[in-house]
């Protein structure tokens, strides 16, 4: 029972809500049915909307109910009957994955989505994903999601909604489809009373080899209005206490939620036609037919439901006129009035064809004659499956009638439903509401033609006795003497009513409209500060959906590489609003530019590079702003100019392939059809160029928002070759724990691109030089383009290009060769027995199952079959490199080799300078692993390296080579590295099942976006180098990064000695560093360290033993939640056959005492140190070996004594 004080509190709260005009809603948190999954947060934490196919809405206003699948499936369940089901999944970065390589939310392989995998059955299969029960969708409810599928062999995708006994098909498609950036689905559910469920199904044939995936489901404006104690001024108060805007009364939709806004008592003076029983007062001239969806669908573009009943059994009008023929519907005659507006609300449907057109005319009756029709509305194109609401207010001094004209394009349909005349639309006296007669002319075409000098085909422009075809309109080249063919092609100051050809194609509550500045209020003047001036302004529209406003140009192109759009814009909005420019090509949108966070309200000049594009493409302004929000929110565009777009105009820089990017980008320009782009940037922060360290370079960040798509292109203008061979040299930068692939290719007209060079994964935080020989066909008509492509098969890191140079003649031999793209100029000798191959099919010549570079069957290597039938015993097969330049100092030539299990013979390495000298000889049985070989090279003249395979006469034997590299400095001992010249024999190992992240290589002095030690251990300065890994990129899920040694021979006892560094803030969860021994018997963790550590280098010694060949693996991982900080390694030393020696404690600098507590703490630490040493001495007497020790590096304050002791199994270590 509620006490008087309780009643008083409730009364006070109720009165406060009354006085403030705010929502007053009882708390329904404990109601399991009525207040759950209805798109309204009844609980303060919105817990009543959890697991409803979405999660509770954000506290930020105007945000949708969303499920991005990052936490869980949000209640979506698989109800498929076959063995293949929808699952919440996450992709790796591997290109051989059947599903998407990234999600849509994050755009990386760390994100989650719902997917159904490969179907290998003999019959077509349908997989269905169903939502939980949802309740009460508003008429404005819109479901948006992103989908991905392999378009080659998926039969159909469907989105259905089931309520009561009826299932509505909201959307269905048989393609085409594309990757994440290309396909967003937005469907309007319409008003749904009571409970309903949504299902997404994919039907695939028996040969489908790819995955179907869904991500980022959003429910926009689905909740019914909540009861209000008092409505804003002018709003209608519904019977259920909800509030709706005045224009929502009698509009044919249940906006209140209880249909009181459509009460016949309120709407009795409106003339509404829903076509359920006929045409009402409207008259069909030709082309329209009344129909419904159930059992009548003649194509997928046919309306699946009407608007009035939101049912497949509801009636509507649809145009059945042949393409090119206009269907006309006209109203009865209404009285004219200058004192009020006659409002006409209507719903139309345009779907299936870009050639669909709909127009609304008003035809007035003068004193003696009927006046020509006046066009009030015109829409064309593909608007999706929604019924779009619009409204016109007609004020006429003379009687008038309304004409509705529709023309369908190929495969498309135009529909009409719910034609509603307001109470101010009064019939002419004596005119029946059931029928009327048409007097006067009607439009026989949607676009009435003026008199022309010459008849041209449809779509052609007549000028100067010419018929300009569509592909030459807006191609940035003037064909007409007066330039009529380029008049409405995007360039405009909006002073002309044609608006430069920009056309609003919005379907929601916002629209683009040419407006006069002094009337718009936001802003009050145009760009030229003229109050009477015009600009393209974002305004309110009569649509019911909260969709973006869109304005589109006519078809443009082709354009040249220097094509730019210049404009001024105004943008002021809350954080959820945006203003953007996109390019539409072949149904896909590429985001070119987005306005930064809300400006101060003034006009801003902006230049946007469009670049070289093929015909046809269109430009589109897209914006979403809450015009009713606080402040002067709004968006506007003015003075749009397309400059330097003629593709036939060339400049001197177009032939400049050599470029340091200091002045401009020379002949290089960015490619398109992806939201990821190369940018010419100036050195700043962690990004620096190669030329000066402070200049410009080309930069690609695969995570740079809104980067999406498979990759980014950087290519030259077409070039004319002048010599048969040229050498292209360039500097590249690949850095990051999971950076993708950088490729170089040559493109010739009419031919497939030829891959010339590629690198994958991190190459350390430094610039590397590479060169490639270009082979040309010297024919006058043969031109070529060079193109770099940065592939987004990795998402953490950056790519850079700088200092391109082209010279006549061939290049020197490459310093690095992975054989992924070519044979790198290696010559197989007279017999040609060395071949480049991979084992992807499993049916190729004899050789390793996987390569060393990628660790996959798709990777390439060089191999020679040493079987006696091809290479008799004692015979040799040589593989010779191109010439290397003279060496100014000693260098290390390293390579990875693979010998077949049975002894294939001897692999010898020679260096050919003025004479030929043998540097290395390898023989014996092989195995299943790639092994590292290395030789020290000194050469004062040009030299070559020769690999020679001498056969032993064993059947089914081979020798293989991969990853040949030349680095400055002498070669390191096996398992050892000071990291001053690179990673030595240590390399990235893929983490099982998830691809992997790479350890990186850097110095403290080199700028980097990732935290790392400020100095190394080897030299103790910022110029020294080390290996490191940034743990923050791992994310949850137990992933790790592995750095593995070369295979090491079996050992009874050996000592591993290294220095490590951890830099984790104390308030973060910590990462872990582990040492694993990996062999064919499995993996064994022999040491680990985690937790917060002070930023310092610590020493570790571990004694290891193994009865078979093994690898040492350093694993960087997380103990739980994501950590923020680096783990680093330096001075790794593997002492084969030696016991570890107790390290001498380092003498760090002694800090002067600053306070009594510090002195007391120091004494206590000294006591603990002596106690620890005494304990160690006692352990020594007990004959227990010290298997692992830590010590602090010289030059660092060792405030805490750090020691780790690991007791290893006897199978791994042995007592001294």
UniProtKB/Swiss-Prot annotation:
Claim: Transport is one of the keywords in the record: yes
PROSITE patterns: LDLRA_1 (PS01209), LDLRA_2 (PS50068), MAM_2 (PS50060)
Gene3D superfamilies given in the database record: 2.60.120.200, Low-density Lipoprotein Receptor
Gene Ontology CC entries for this record: endosome; membrane
TM region(s), chain numbering: 1156-1176
Extracellular-facing ranges: 22-1155
Expressed in which tissues: Apical endosomal tubules of developing rat intestinal epithelial cells.
Xref: CDD domains: LDLa, MAM
Domain LDL-receptor class A: 27-54, 229-269, 454-491
Limits of the MAM domain: 62-224, 268-427, 492-647, 654-813, 812-973, 972-1142
Protein name: Apical endosomal glycoprotein
Gene: Mamdc4
């Amino acid at each position: 029972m509620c006490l008087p004080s309780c009643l008083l509190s409730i009364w006070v709260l109720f009165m406060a809500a009354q006085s403030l005009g705010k929502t007053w809603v009882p708390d329904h948190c404990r109601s399991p049915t009525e207040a759950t999954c209805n798109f309204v947060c009844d609980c303060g934490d919105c817990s009543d909307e959890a697991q409803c196919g979405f999660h509770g809405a954000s506290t930020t206003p105007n945000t949708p109910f969303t499920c991005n699948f990052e936490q869980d499936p949000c209640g979506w369940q698989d109800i498929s009957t076959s063995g293949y089901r929808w699952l919440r999944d996450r992709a790796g970065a591997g290109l051989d994955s059947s599903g998407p390589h990234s999600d849509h939310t994050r755009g990386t392989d760390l994100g989650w989505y719902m997917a159904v995998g490969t179907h290998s059955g003999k019959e077509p299969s349908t997989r269905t994903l169903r939502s939980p029960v949802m309740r009460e969708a508003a008429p404005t409810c819109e479901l948006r999601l992103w989908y991905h599928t392999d378009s080659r062999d998926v039969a159909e995708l469907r989105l259905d909604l089931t309520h009561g006994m009826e299932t509505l098909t909201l959307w269905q498609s048989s393609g085409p489809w594309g990757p994440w950036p290309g396909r967003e689905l937005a469907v309007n559910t319409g008003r749904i009373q009571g409970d309903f469920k949504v299902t997404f199904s994919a039907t695939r044939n028996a040969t489908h080899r790819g995955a179907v995936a869904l991500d980022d489901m959003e429910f926009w404006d689905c909740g019914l209005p909540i009861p209000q104690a008092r409505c804003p001024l002018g709003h209608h108060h519904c019977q259920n206490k909800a509030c709706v805007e005045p224009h929502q009364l009698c509009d044919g939709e249940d906006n209140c939620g209880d249909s009181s806004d459509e009460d016949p008592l309120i709407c009795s003076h409106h003339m509404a036609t829903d076509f359920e029983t006929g045409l009402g007062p409207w008259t069909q001239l030709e082309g329209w037919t009344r129909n419904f969806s159930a059992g009548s669908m003649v194509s997928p573009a046919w309306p699946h439901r009407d608007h009035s009943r939101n049912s497949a059994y509801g009636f509507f009008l649809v145009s059945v006129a042949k393409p090119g023929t206009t269907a006309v519907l006209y109203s009865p005659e209404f009285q004219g009035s200058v004192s009020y507006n006659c409002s006409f609300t209507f719903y139309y449907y345009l779907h299936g064809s870009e050639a669909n057109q709909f127009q609304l005319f008003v035809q007035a009756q003068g004193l003696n004659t009927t006046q020509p029709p006046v066009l009030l509305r015109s829409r064309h194109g593909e608007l999706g499956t929604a019924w779009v609401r619009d409204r016109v207010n007609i004020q006429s001094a003379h009687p008038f009638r309304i004409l509705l004209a529709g023309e369908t394009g190929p495969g498309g349909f135009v529909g009409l439903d719910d034609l509603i005349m307001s109470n101010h639309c009064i019939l002419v006296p004596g005119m029946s509401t059931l029928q009327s007669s048409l007097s006067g002319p009607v439009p026989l075409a949607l676009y009435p033609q003026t008199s022309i000098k010459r008849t041209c085909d449809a779509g052609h422009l007549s000028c100067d006795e010419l018929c300009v075809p569509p592909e030459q309109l807006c191609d940035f080249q003037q064909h007409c003497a007066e330039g009529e063919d380029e008049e409405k092609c995007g360039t405009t100051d909006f002073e002309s009513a044609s608006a430069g050809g920009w056309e609003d194609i919005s379907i929601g509550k916002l629209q683009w409209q040419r407006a006069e500045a002094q009337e718009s209020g936001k802003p009050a003047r145009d760009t030229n500060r003229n109050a009477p001036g015009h600009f393209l302004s974002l305004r309110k529209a009569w649509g019911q959906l909260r969709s973006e406003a869109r304005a589109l140009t006519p078809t443009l192109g082709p354009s040249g590489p220097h094509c730019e759009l210049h404009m001024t814009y105004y943008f002021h909005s809350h954080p959820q609003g945006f203003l953007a420019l996109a390019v539409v090509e072949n149904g896909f949108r590429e985001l070119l530019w987005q306005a930064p966070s809300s400006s101060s309200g003034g006009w801003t000049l902006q230049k946007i590079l469009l670049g070289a594009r093929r015909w046809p493409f269109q430009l589109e302004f897209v914006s979403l702003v809450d015009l009713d929000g606080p402040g002067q929110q709004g968006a506007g565009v003015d003075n749009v100019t397309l400059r330097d777009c003629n593709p036939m105009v060339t400049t001197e820089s177009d032939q400049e392939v050599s470029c340091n990017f200091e002045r401009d980008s020379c002949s290089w320009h960015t490619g398109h059809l992806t939201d990821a782009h190369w940018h010419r940037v100036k050195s700043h922060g962690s990004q620096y160029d190669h030329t000066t360290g402070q200049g410009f370079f080309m930069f690609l960040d695969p995570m740079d928002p809104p980067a999406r798509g498979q990759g980014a292109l950087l290519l030259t203008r077409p070039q004319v070759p002048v010599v048969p061979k040229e050498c292209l040299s360039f500097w590249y930068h690949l850095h990051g724990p999971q950076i993708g692939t950088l490729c170089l290719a040559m493109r010739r007209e009419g031919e497939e691109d030829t891959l010339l060079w590629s690198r994958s994964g991190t190459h350390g935080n430094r610039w590397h030089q590479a060169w490639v020989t270009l082979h040309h066909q010297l024919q006058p008509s043969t031109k070529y383009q060079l193109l770099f492509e940065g592939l987004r098969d990795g998402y953490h890191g950056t790519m850079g290009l700088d200092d391109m140079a082209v010279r006549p003649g061939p290049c020197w031999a490459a310093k690095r060769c992975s054989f992924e793209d070519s044979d790198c100029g290696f010559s197989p000798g007279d017999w040609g027995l060395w071949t480049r191959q991979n084992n992807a099919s499993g049916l190729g010549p004899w050789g390793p199952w996987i390569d060393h570079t990628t660790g996959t069957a798709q990777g390439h290597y060089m191999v020679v079959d040493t079987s006696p039938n091809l290479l008799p015993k004692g015979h040799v097969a040589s593989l010779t490199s191109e010439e290397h330049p003279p060496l100014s100092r000693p260098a290390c030539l390293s390579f990875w080799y693979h010998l077949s299990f049975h002894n294939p013979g001897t692999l010898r390495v020679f260096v050919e300078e003025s004479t030929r000298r043998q540097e290395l000889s390898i023989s014996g049985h092989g195995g299943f692993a790639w092994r590292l070989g290395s030789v020290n090279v000194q050469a004062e003249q040009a030299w070559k390296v020769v690999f020679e395979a001498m056969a032993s006469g064993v059947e089914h034997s081979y020798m293989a080579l991969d990853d040949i590299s030349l680095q400055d400095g002498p070669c390191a001992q096996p398992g050892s590295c000071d990291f001053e010249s690179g990673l030595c024999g240590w390399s990235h190992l893929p983490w099982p099942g998830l691809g992997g992240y790479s350890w990186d290589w850097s110095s403290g002095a080199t700028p980097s976006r990732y935290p790392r030690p400020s100095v190394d251990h080897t030299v103790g300065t910022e110029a020294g180098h080390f290996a490191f890994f940034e743990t923050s990129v791992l994310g949850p899920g137990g992933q790790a990064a592995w750095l593995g040694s070369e295979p090491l021979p079996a050992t009874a006892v050996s000592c591993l000695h290294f220095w490590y560094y951890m830099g984790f803030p104390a308030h973060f969860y910590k990462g872990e560093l582990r040492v694993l021994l990996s062999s064919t018997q499995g993996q064994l963790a022999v040491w680990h360290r985690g937790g917060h550590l002070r930023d310092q280098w610590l020493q570790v010694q571990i004694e290891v033993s193994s009865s078979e060949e093994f690898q040492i693996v350093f694993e960087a991982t997380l103990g739980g939640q994501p950590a923020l900080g680096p783990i680093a390694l330096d001075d790794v030393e593997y002492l084969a056959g030696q016991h570890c020696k107790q390290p001498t404690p380092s003498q760090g600098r002694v800090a002067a005492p600053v306070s009594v507590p510090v002195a007391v703490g120091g004494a206590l630490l000294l006591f603990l140190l002596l106690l620890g040493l005494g304990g160690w001495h006692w352990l020594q007497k007990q004959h227990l070996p010290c298997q692992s020790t830590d010590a602090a590096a010289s030059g660092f304050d060792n405030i805490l004594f750090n020691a780790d002791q690991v007791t290893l199994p006897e199978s791994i270590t042995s007592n001294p």
